[in-house]
Structures are given as C-alpha cells and as structure tokens.
Amino acid sequence: MKSRHACTILLLMSIPAMSVVAAETIRFATFNTSLNRNKAGALQEELEGGNSVQARKIAQILQRVRPDVVLLNEVDYDSSGKTVQLFRQQYLEVSQGNQPPLHYQHTFLAPVNTGIPSGIDLDRNGETGQPGDAFGFGRFPGQYGMLVLSRYPIDEKRARTFQKFPWKKMPGALLPVDPSSSEPYYPAEAVGVFRLSSKSHWDVPIQAGENMIHLLASHPTPPVFDGPEDRNGRRNHDEIRLWADYIRPSRSNYLVDDHGQRGGLARGAHFVIAGDMNADPLDGDTVPGAIGQLLDQRKVNSRQIPASTGAVAFRDTGANADHRGSARNDTADFPDQGPGNLRVDYVLPSRSLRVLESGVFWPPAGEPASALLDASDHRLVWVDVTFK
C-alpha cells in the first residue's frame, strides 16, 4: 500500500471493506490497556493462539462498551502490524465472556519514541543506552505504543504525526532547569535533539459520512520518576500544551509535523482529543494547570465529565483521603500510598460536537464485570457525540 508517510504508518484492512451506516451517535473511547512487555516481540508471542488472559479481559471490556473509535495506549508497537492483527482477529473478533464479537475495519498504527536511543545520557546517571536515555522511556523501540481502531474510514493521506517535533521549537517551552545551579538541566547537545513527545502525537482524520473528525491522540509522559528539576512534569505539561496550541490557529504556526507540514487544525474543524494524559486537574504531581490547558480551552467541550459508581467504592484510604477531585471521575486505580486514584484518561470533543452521554468502565465490586478490572490499572473512558 502506498503512503506518503515514510515513518511506516499502517492502515490495516485485512477484513473485507464494509460500509458503515451513518449513525446519529459516534462513541469515542480511550483505554490504557497495559499490553506492554519488557522484551521486544514478547506481546506478539503471548497473543498467538488467543489464550492471553489479560488480552481476553481487555477485549471483553471493549466488547461490552463497543466504541466506534478507540485509542489504545500501551500496546507494544511492531512495524509489521502482526501484533495488532492477532489482537483484533483472535481476541476482539472472538466472543469473550459471551459478549458479541467486535469488528474494526480500520486501524492506524505508527512508530513512537519510547525505546529509541538518543545517544545521550538524558537521565544523567552516568550511562548511555539505558531506558531513561531513549527519546521516550522504554526498554526497546515501540514499548508502550499506541493504536487506533475505528469502524469509520481513516483518511490516511491527511493523517499527521509529530513524533520528531523538537521540544526547543515550542515557544516558551518549559525545559527544565537544574535548581542547584540555575543552569539548563539538559546540556546543549541534548536540547538539540530532544523530542517533545514521549510517545507521539497523532492527528488521525476519521471520516464519518460527509463529516471529518480529527482524533488527536497522545500519551504524555508521567510527571514523576525525576528529581527537583521536574523534567518529566515539565515535559508532560508541554506535551499537553501541544494539543492546546494545535487546535488554535493563532497559536499553532510553530508546529511542523514529521513531513514538514506547518500549522495546526483549520478553524472550525471537528476534533476529539483522547489519551492517557497522566494529569489530574486537582490531584497528583503534575505541573499546576497542565490538563487545564485543555479543560479550560473554549474550543473544548469539557463540561460533561465521564464518571462511574465503581470508582467511588475504590476510593480507599491513604493518598485518596486528601484528594480534592471527585472519586466518581477517577480513571486510574493507582497505589493508595501515593498518588492514589486519579482522573488521567480523557476523551475531549470540540464544542462543534454535541456530547450525548459519557462514562468510565468501572463496575462496582461484586458485579461480574468487576473481575475484568485487574487487566489494567486504567479504566476505559467513553463519550458519545453527534454533530450539531
């Protein structure tokens, strides 16, 4: 298949083409599946034969919620697309827990920065070639990758990726400073090659009848695992900021994608921002206001907050007791000793779309579906939208 993308973007269509009837409602979702392994090829090997317990649970969750378009975070990337095919054909398209099989005719897959060596000692531990020295933390290229599945056609020719965008090119970038010297934390050689995106930022155009919706997909770095310089917190902030600038024509001219196209979304374009943003609006360790760059943006429809009853019951002791945010909006079950459960996964439509319903897949303890929750420490978040 020909593609203008040199970075091996795959539009996989192993299923015969099937028309999607224009529907009044489109369900978008994001789900950090934790389908990552510590060795390249290990996930693909595990998926062979359809017997992975974790993957079967992930597939059943998807079959229960049945999103039309879903971003999956933390699915190890392989350039052949074999891992995706195995998950789709041997898990999603096979009934799990008596749920109807789920078919996605369109898949978007592209490389990510995790595990790609930078050649520089980025974490300043005296060694190079370690996971913390990659452009995004990872033990091999593609660990913690991303994947988009869609019932609606994907306009591959108009898809854009920002995997290689340099952090220093962002005006006013929050590049870290060494508090002990007030000097830049990263040496000039590191700043010269440092990529903003810890995985990647994708603009995936979804063709819904005569309308186009841009799925803006990413997975910013966790704002922890660093020191007083807060290098990961600052990067997380600016990874989120990329989308806040991208959706505003007056702020996006500095952005250049991996194929040299400048600028962001056209004025009036429909979009849905999705992903594990690793940022809670009130709690956790993020730079203050990080996710507010999106939640408070007038182009974003963020009033209806996805919620669940199960999350309330999971609000245990420890760090959760001091949280300011409502437990019903949490999307991740993190350790009680810290940071506690947080709202870090988002599906944020543009105001040009009408939000009908939303939710978080977090069934209360005791319900049969609660047995699926140990498949990941994150919960699937979904939002139903329609055109105004």
What are the functions of these language-model segments?
Residues 1-9:
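Bacterial N-terminal signal peptides that target proteins for export
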